[in-house]
Amino acid sequence: MIVLGILCLIIMVFILLNYRYKNSFYYQNLVEFENRPVRKIYWSDKIKMVNLGSVHARFAFQYFKNEGVSLARAPQSLYYDIQLLENYSKHIPRDTIVVAFFPIGLFALKNYTSLNQIAKYYYELPKDRIEKYSLLKYIIAVKYPILYAGKKAIYSIVNRKIDSEWSYQKCVVSEERLKKIAQEHCDVWKKQFQLENLTDADTTHLIPCFEYNRKLLERLVDKCKAQGWKLVFVNGPMARQMNEMFSEKFLQNFYYSNFQDIAEKNNVLHLDYRLDDTFQDDNNLFWNGVDWLSETGRRVFMEKLENDLYKNGYWEGDQP
């Protein structure tokens, strides 16, 4: 009886901590950061645009007039871009603009595998669209997320308010700090993709990833053609400090060569804002200073994007 009582107590404490964790500021901010839908997505007949993408797109798109839906999740691979788009295809009318937003490392990555990175899809997608679906992972991800929280589980006990990154409006730091932030980002990419540098590194070991993602991109093109959607390839803005970390030769080999020919062959509009003058030296447009747009930055970017879509005949109706 004593053992049973202790076991019941442990279970009760676990359930309580899990409940508190799911309702903590940390967990709610995580949900918002991922852009995980907390309720059914509202698809109105006024929707003109749907965007895909990962973290950079998560902070680039905000539809101030409710004329679009963001399917960007943080983080997200091209595989799940397509899974989400196909999953919601019945809600997306013909002539909708579909923006495929390409972060720098997109084509060097096949997929994310850790539960921390894919848990969001267990809330949103049917199991046949989740790679290596597991009922156990579903139970952990949806019912008991405290089990993969690690040290962050402390927020189930100490529920301290944390500001959401989504609401950040500007970044006020020194030039030296901005360069350090850019370097830290690049160090992560070098480690993740096994690159010696970002100027002339050998990328032959990444060819299987490049080929895998090119096939997915062709699938995306075919899907948009079949549905009558207007596909657009977009490269997001980066601050000068970030752009200085790369050579153009490296980016052509590692990045642009994976989609430029597909765009040309299929007559897909390509809009590149990476070197846009507006974003080079106004770090208040990025909440992290270099590549994740702030609230102000989103307004500037969305205005530019919508006007460019209008000029190219993609945006129907009055000029934005």
Residue ranges and their predicted role:
Residues 1-9:
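N-terminal Sec-pathway targeting helices
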Residues 12-88:
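Membrane/wall-proximal cationic-aromatic binding patches
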Residues 106-113, 242-244, 280-283:
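Extracytoplasmic/secreted cell-surface and envelope-processing proteins
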Residues 115-227, 317-320:
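Secreted/periplasmic serine-hydrolase-like ester/acetyl group-modifying domain
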Residues 221-247:
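Active-site segments of SGNH/GDSL-like serine hydrolases
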Residues 240-273:
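Substrate-gating cap/lid alpha-helix
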Residues 286-320:
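Histidine-centered active-site loop/cap adjacent to the catalytic His
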